[in-house]
Structures are given as structure tokens and as C-alpha cells.
Amino acid sequence: MKVHLINPSNVSFGTAVITPRWLYVLAAATPTFYGAPNLVDETLVRTDPLTIEPGDVVGIGIHTGNALRGYEIGRMARSRGAYVVFGGIHASLYPAEAAELGGAHAVVKGDGDLAWAHVLEDCSQGAPKPLYVGGRIEGSEFLPARWDLLPANRYMWASVQTVRGCPKHCSFCSVWRTDGQRPRQRSSDAVLEEIVDLRRRGFRFIALADDNFYPVTLTDLELASRQNNAARLSELKAIRDERFELMCRLAQLPADTVFFTQITMEAAEDPEFLTAMKAAHIHGALVGVESVTPEGLKDVYKDFNLAGQNLVERLRKFRRHDIHVLGSFIFGLPSDRPETFAATAAVAEQAELTFAQFVMLTPFPGTVDFARWEQTMQGDPTRIAGVPLTRGWLIPQAIRPKLFWTHPVMAADEIRRRTQEVWDRFYSIRVIWRRSRFLRSIKGRLAFVMISKLYRRMYADTGIATDSARVAWSTRWARWLAKPTRSLFAGRPMPDLQVPQPAELLS
């Protein structure tokens, strides 16, 4: 019985930006007596059906965006006599769909770290269960990924997870519902061992692939203190102390190490935390700005963010600590108006963001937005390729709409066009070159231009429908840029690098 793990993708670039962590974690969860699993990341290369034989087990991890491709692979694998198992956020939300459309014998709902071995045992006995509930395991149970199975020279960034869960409740995000609002944090020892393993292999750019690297805010501590909730305050301080211990040890890694993470904007009001991030080589962070207006922030349940000039000043605080921000903005909110687009572009430039992404509001399953939208769509007769809009991920990619939400004052095409104009403005050669001034050398600035253009080409898919010719052209363009760009991120292997010790052991 051969085990296959497949990460579906609609396009393959040959080179990928970041390692799909789940693939290598489940490889670690595969008992050794089954042998090393066959790993397929379709962002690199398409699945070869001929590798799948009767009696094999094929595990497919899906999110909403790649579910349709995942179902195609599942049906193919089942037709070849394999046991088909689905997991991931989307399969956890729609297990029956994976069985009906993807040929699933089984679905793992929730974390798969511990459940996967049980799935394989049942498949080996010819009796897989329809549903396995992995639940939410504790941080101490998170498995380190099997990075020894990585193909050489194919990824720009590696990925390590330090915490799962996010205490926020943004309306457009499913993380707090699927991963929970209680931070489940790995020990510093486990995180450092995995990072050192990657540095030994030549990765120096590593994403801390967390839902929120800043799980305890100063406001959280103040609130617990005002409420005289000693137990809650102690719990929060322990989580915060663990963050600082981790960053203190990350700071001992070689100086050319670069970490990138995801964080809420509230961290900008915590100079001690930002200082520790800088020392820990955390030089980049994705920050969900979402909207530049107070009304827009209320639309997405994110009114803990600031707006206007206050927003600009808060974002600049990251840069003052040498942390480069990838700002994420949403267009198409109910309160958005035509003038919102230019105002957002201006804020992105004034706030000294290094990168930015501008996405159109899409109601994803598992979110508050989706539940509200699905309710309003009851009885709507609209079908595309026979599929209702509320199951838009099942519409073939070539004709799938990019915007589903009806806006009170703007047509979908206007939102798409104005969104594209903001992408074009932020990623024009002139503006990118101006942003590159933080780099000292011409070579470095030219590399920054190339990386910026690659990011824009790979992620600025804002067409009202995904035209297959445009996708093919974009894929060729991105593939041409990806290989030379990957070399910019590569580091030299450090086989003798040791795991940094806690501060008390160094004194």
C-alpha cells in the first residue's frame, strides 16, 4: 500500500513561493512501515495518474479555492482503485461534498496530525470510516514537518508554524471558527528545532505560518487586569512570555535569516514586541488593514483597527522597527464608494508599505460574511454551468465569477476595474522603484522590482472571470520570473548549525 499526499492547484509554475506545510506534516504523521509517502505539490507539477495503483491511499488537502481541482483528482484516484481521503479547511466544512463530488472514502475533519495514522490503519484493513474527527490538538502535539522529503531548489520560502488559532472574529475570515479563538502555541524548543533543520538545508527565508503571531495584545492584558481576573491574566502573560522566549532564541540565529509572519495591527502599539521582532530577524509581516475608513472596518467587524491618518502613522511604526509590511485591503465592502479606491491607494503609499494586495470581497465558507450572504441568496435562481452562486467554488475555473456580492451602489465590473487600477498604480515601475529606496545597491533595487512584479503577476487575479488565455499567459510570465527570483532567496546550507539555547542557559 503506497501513500500519496496531493496539494491540488489549477496552475503549475515549476517553482513555488512557499512550501505547503500540511503536505510535509502529514508525511511526518505517516507511520514509517508504510514507507515514505509520494508527495505531489501541483504548484510545481501536475499529478501523474499512472503513479496511483489499486489499494493505495491518496490524501488530498483542499481549501475552497482548489476544491474543484481536488475533487477531480479524487475521482481519478478512486477510478484507479485507490482509497481517497480528503482533509483541509474546506473538507472540514463540507465533508459530504467531498464524498459526493470527490469520490472520498473518508474525510478528516479538523487537525490531521494525530488522526492520519488511524485513517491509514483502517484503509490497510479495507475498512475506512466515512468521517474522522481530528478536532483541535494542543500545541505540544503539533508534528514537525518532514523537510527531508522536499525537492531541491523548488521553493523560495520554507514555512514553520508556531501557533494555531486567532482570538479575533473578523467577518471575512474562517480561521477563528475552524482553528478556534484560543491560541494553541508550540514550545520554543519544537519551533527552533524545525527552523534549524531548514537552515541546515539552505533555507534562510522562512515564513512563520501562523494565524496570528501576536495572540495577546496589550489591550487583552489591561482588560484582564481591570476585571481582576487573575487566572486569565496569568494565562495571557504565559502566552506572551513564550512569544518573547521564542524571539530571544530566534535572535541567536545567523544574521542573514529572514522571517515573515502574519500579525494584527495592534502590535504597532507594543514597541517592546516590535523591538523583539526586529532582533529576532522578523523583517516582514502581513497585516490585515482591510479598509481605510471607519465604516469599512465596521463592515468586517474589525473596528479595533484605525483609519485615515491614524492608520498611516500606525503602519509606519512597523517600518521604524525595520519590519516590512504586506498590507492587505478589501474592496467591495457595502460602505465602499468610487472614491474609496484612490483613497486606499494613497494610504498604501503614504504608510510606506513594501507590498500590498487588493482583493475583492468574496464570501468564503465558514465566515460570517458567507452565512449572511447565503441567507440573502435563498431562492435565487441564478446558475452558472448548473451550479448555484452559493456554491461558486464548484463552477469551472474558466467561467467562475470573481465577485459574488451585490454592492449597493457599484456594479461588479466597476469594482473589478477600479481594483485593477489600484494594483496597476501600486505596482507601476515608477512607484516600485521609489519604494525600493530602502535598499542601498542598484542590484538590490532591481531585484526588488523583479520580486514586486512577480508578486503582482501571481496574485493580482481580479478579472470578473478567469479567462483561460490570460491564465496561461500569466503562468508563463510568472514561471519565467520565478526561477531567477528563487535564487535571490536561497542561502547556503549550514549542516553544523546548532539549536539556540534559552537565555538562562547562555549565562
What are the residue ranges of the model-derived segments?
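Radical SAM enzyme core and accessory elements
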Residues: 2-8, 36-39, 51, 99, ...
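Acidic, low-complexity intrinsically disordered segments
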Residues: 1-203
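Alpha-helical structural signal in soluble globular domains
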Residues: 29-33, 76, 80, 97, ...
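Structural recognition of alpha->loop->beta junctions
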Residues: 97-118, 276-285, 343-358
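Residue-level signal for short, function-critical loop segments
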Residues: 9-11, 64, 212, 265, ...
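Radical SAM [4Fe-4S] cluster-binding motif and immediate context
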Residues: 143-326, 333, 338-342, 346
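A structural preference for short, hydrophobic beta-strand core positions in alpha/beta folds
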Residues: 38-41, 86, 261, 327, ...
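Flexible glycine/acidic-rich beta-alpha junction loops that bind and position SAM and/or redox cofactors
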Residues: 95-97, 168, 205, 214-228, ...
